[in-house]
């Protein structure tokens, strides 16, 4: 399920000044350096191999330089590739540093599993954040035997995701499997009640 958000513009806008590529690069580097110093990691957009590598690299780096010290993982994602997401998830769970997760705007699909996988008691959501859980989707081509194999694998992936959410949220496996049958949307309050997050974050 894709949601398109409208971009609102002021009626009168001052013309944008030309960007200096070097200034843009240096500005990005300075922001990045500051966030690393503050042990902040961001997922902004789809979960794929590129974002998975960037996030995993940062988690492992922060663990290496100061093991056991808190990391804050900010999430605004529609979800994406399950295997890429599980690399992040497993890394979060294996390092000694507690990982606090924060839903900034939307944590959908694989993003919701990452959100729920934060350290218990340290999972947060912004006041207008939204969470969506559902079963995995995909498509394929091939022989009937190939399609049967894919269907079996999809079912295994669905059950794995449901079990992770059940364990992280304190829900039964059966309830999560039932909720997976459709796009299941939750606002901030509902996501706390479901157990995906622990607290509403009203001030940074």
What are these regions (language model features)?
Residues 1-204:
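Terminal-region recognition feature
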